[in-house]
Amino acid sequence: LPLTSFGREKNAFRDYLLRDGRTVSFRYEGQEYSITIRKVSLFPQGYAAVLTQSILLDEPSVIVADIGGWTVDLMRLDNRIPNASTCRSLELGMIRCLDEIGEQIRRALGLSMTATQMESVLRGDAVHINEDARKIIDRQADAYVHRLLSAITESGLDTRAMPAVFLGGGAALLKRNVSAADGLCRPVI
């Protein structure tokens, strides 16, 4: 389940999947099946990503930050258990970052770059991009990362005090812009 709705929707979603013990019938690859779901385990998005990081398994608290298109969803795990009361959603997704980058490039250079071009630069893939535009993209991405880290801290999750796992498409794009030099305890992307 999405981080911010995990605590609120967990029981309803479990009930939906269990279907009051009723049999569920379906066809798969031409074969008929009838099953009864007896047990359901639910976890927040990104939970498996934390558990696969052996360096984090003994950490008492870990921040999970899922950077999506429109929002950044946050949750803290305490002793590997999701703490639903710490869920937050920040309206700082990658679309806002890319819009700001595009606006700065238009103002400074009069160029109209696509989101795909900007994403390519953020990943370190683009080769045929105006060098001044590349510098603006890098500078704006750094500014976005600092704004994001500040917002995470303001929401009560201090990235300087506990490790943070960054997930989602936005995390992949910003991988080159986040490091321990940003004051992070231990970033995992």
Predicted regions and their residues:
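Short, basic interhelical loop/turn and adjoining N-cap
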Residues: 109-113
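Nucleotide/phosphate-binding catalytic cleft detector across ATP-hydrolyzing
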Residues: 1-62, 81-96, 116-189
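Short beta-strand scaffold segments in enzyme catalytic cores
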Residues: 72-76
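Conserved AAA+ ATPase "sensor/coupling" helix adjacent to the nucleotide-binding pocket
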Residues: 104-108
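Active-site-proximal alpha-helical scaffolds that flank and shape metal-associated catalytic sites
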Residues: 65-69
